[in-house]
């Protein structure tokens, strides 16, 4: 058995860049949430956005609808407890790529499973800000980081009121 199959986390925020998971928590109401097997939607009032997602067997489409004008961020983490993940951004192709080596959680616990989960995130907006991070340290303009714990990439872009962003 393997852990997380090389998962990653994609988080949207508005107005302030918060990279660490414990700092980007936000309030939500289940009354503002819709969940079906084919669609998920939630309104995040503190982030001034609605996040929507639909999926296929190996991909997903995210739509973020911003309720007011300002600066929006997407934060992406390779979820590697062992600090073996890697992530990079290609700003010309408007693409974020990464991988996360998978480790066993039952027989042979902690040993490498022999494969990695890979991910690609395509975005459409022109960026006004991007970089990498490790823990609370930001590295503006840096395009790749890897093989350490609590790493990721952030991208920032300007949005207009009621603008929708597809990822």
Language model feature labels by segment:
Residues 1-167:
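Accessory carbohydrate-recognition regions in carbohydrate-active enzymes
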């Amino acid at each position: 058995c393997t852990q997380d199959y090389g998962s990653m986390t994609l988080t949207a925020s508005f107005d302030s860049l918060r990279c660490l998971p414990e700092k980007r928590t936000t309030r939500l109401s289940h009354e503002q949430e819709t969940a079906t097997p084919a669609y998920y939607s939630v309104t995040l009032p503190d982030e001034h956005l609605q996040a929507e997602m639909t999926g296929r067997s190996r991909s997903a489409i995210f739509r973020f609808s911003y309720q007011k004008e300002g600066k929006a961020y997407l934060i992406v983490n390779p979820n590697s407890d062992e600090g073996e993940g890697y992530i990079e951004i290609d700003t010309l192709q408007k693409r974020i790529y990464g991988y996360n080596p998978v480790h066993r959680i039952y027989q042979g616990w902690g040993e490498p499973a022999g494969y990695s989960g890979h991910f690609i995130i395509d975005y459409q907006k022109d960026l006004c800000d991007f970089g990498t991070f490790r823990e609370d340290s930001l590295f503006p303009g840096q395009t790749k980081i890897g093989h350490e714990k609590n790493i990721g990439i952030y991208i920032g872009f300007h949005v207009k009121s009621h603008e929708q962003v597809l990822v």
